[in-house]
């Protein structure tokens, strides 16, 4: 193994010494492929690795800025969602994608159980262990998960929202935030759009609503 593989960590953290009820997470922060995953290459051209299928463009920068604004800790993944998706439960069939938005992921097509478990142990589980550790430091922790979404999936209608606030049923902060952001002349806000804020086993379900 090269030095990168030996020193690799599955997450970035910032401000972990801050005592804040806020915790900022970024599940899809990077398009990085660790060298122990198919030699650091999933078989996709560079232009596909820059698409939303590989990560959430811009999300990490927003997470860092929000962490600074709130004086809150930030934890972000250090692996592409195509390696293994940290925003999926371990039993979710989309945990390791073979086809995403019309693009075949060559290195994932024949990944066996041993490969899946290796990616879980090297990437997915260490990231979630860190989120869980930071979330458990206070009883009143509020997790804000930062994502970005593509304006249009292939073969689908355009998404008109400039920002989406996603949340599970019964959550109280998000509706007030939506009202503020959607004030006249402000933003086009998706209320649990472009997708629902509750997916069983996802990162928020695991750490924020358990």
Where are these regions (language model features)?
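N-terminal catalytic or cofactor-binding beta/alpha core of small enzyme domains
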Residues: 2-143, 148-210
